[in-house]
Amino acid sequence: MPCQPIPIIKKTIWLLVLALCSVTAASAQQTNCSAKIDQLPDAPELRGFHLGMTYDQVKARVPPIQFGRTDEFGVAKISINPSFGPQFDKTSFADVRTISLDFLDGKLVTLWVGYESTFKWQKLDEFVSGMSKSLNLPAVWPPKRGGQELRCDGFSVLASLIAGSPGIRLTDEVAQETIANRREAAAAAAEAAETAVIGDQRTKLYYPSDCSARDKVPEASRATFKDKDEAEKAGYKLAKDCQ
């Protein structure tokens, strides 16, 4: 049987699919980033800051800085405005509008630098091109949230325009995962506390979380159950003060 020619339409579709796959593969190859945080050079555009800095290192870089309170998850945040604060050295922070620092357990895990309209790279494409060379990173950063973001091994870099001028954010993604896990654990613990019941080992009575009489049970006599069903299986009965 002679071979049947492939219809022109089907052939065209097939060629388009092949072309799309080639472009996708090429794009993925171009944006691959295996760099690690500790491999990043000290880019002059970051004005002496880098991920992983301690409080003491930041204080040495900016003596007037005052650190904020650390929350229950180990996170502390602070922003400085070198252009407006008379206490900051204008020379070492030339063309910088804002610097925001996020710490986790005393280490810098997010760094944001926003630049003035006098900064040397104002267009997003030229900013990404310049910063990629300065940080020794791949030149192609995929579009993300109105800017361009590059995700590497354990960290990400986002470039965007704010009020017409560029800004860059470096984020320790491993640290962000740690923060998210701590918040989830705290939320789960709070939810468990809401449903937990207190048992009095002396009287074999239990008190739900919304029963104020539970406060009268001494710590030494308390037994904690995840819910009333568990308490009742253990032989406890609902206290009359809670009925």
Give the location of each predicted region.
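Non-cytosolic coordination micro-motifs
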Residues: Q29-A76, T110-A193
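Bacterial N-terminal signal peptides
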Residues: I13-V23
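Sec/Tat signal peptide C-region and signal peptidase I cleavage site
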Residues: T24-A28
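N-terminal secretory signal peptides that target proteins for export/translocation
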Residues: M1-K10
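Extracytoplasmic/periplasmic, Sec-exported soluble proteins
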Residues: D38, L46-M53, T91, S100, ...
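Mid-chain, structured segments of secreted extracytoplasmic proteins
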Residues: R69-K120, Q243
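N-terminal, post-signal-peptide region of Sec/Tat-exported proteins
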Residues: H50-K90, S221, K226-D227, E232-A234
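Mature, structured domains enriched in cysteine- and short glycine motifs
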Residues: N181-Q243
